[in-house]
Amino acid sequence: MLSAEQVEKLVSTRIIVFGTGGVGSAVCNFLVRSGISNLTIVDFDTIDITNLNRQLVANQTNVGKLKVEEMKAQLLNINPNAKITAIAEKYDENSTIDLSQFDIIIDCIDDIKAKKHLIMQAKANNVYILCSMGAGNRYAEIPKFEIADISKTSYDPIAKILRKFCAENRINKLDVCYTKQKATKFDCKTVASVVYYPVMMAGTIVAKVITKIVG
C-alpha cells in the first residue's frame, strides 16, 4: 500500500505527543502501529482505576504506575526497534522541552492554559501542531470527528475558547480535531467518557498525521 519512500518518511518523522489519556494513549498506539518509529510522549500522571474504561494504556496490573512509562513499554512491545522517549512531567510555561527538534506536535492535553502555551510555542518554533478538542460527555451517537481550522469550528466549548485565543494572538491557522455532536449535560462536575469517543478522535488525528507525512 505504501512505497518504500513513504515508509521511510514514517520511520524518520519525529513526533511528540502531549498527554496519554483517553485520546493520547490511543494516538500513541495507532502511530506506532502505523509505522512511526521516533516518538516522544509527555505526561505527568499515574494510571488510576477509573482509567480502565477508556485509556488504552491502563490495565489491572499497572494501576498507580506512570502513564508514560507504561505507554513506552506497550509501544516497544509493538515495535521493539522504535525510539520511544518518555518524559514524566506536567507541561506548562516552565517546560524546557525543545520543540524545534520535532516535525509534528500532537496536543492531547486537557488543561486549557497548557494548550494555549503549547500552541504559542509550536508557532514560535514553526512546528506543525494538531490539537484535540473535547470528546467527553458524549455517548448516544456514532462518533463523527473531523479535522478543521480552529476558525471553522462550532459547538465545542474548548474550541470556542481557543478561537478567541487565536484571534487575540493573531494565530491565522491551527488544525484541530473536533466533533459537531453536542455533549450531553449531566448533574456532575466530572467530565464523563466512554471508550469509543476518544478512540475515534485518536483515529481521526492519526489519519491526518499519517496522510500529512506520506503525502
Model-found features: residue ranges?
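Adenine nucleotide-associated cytosolic modules
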Residues: 1-215
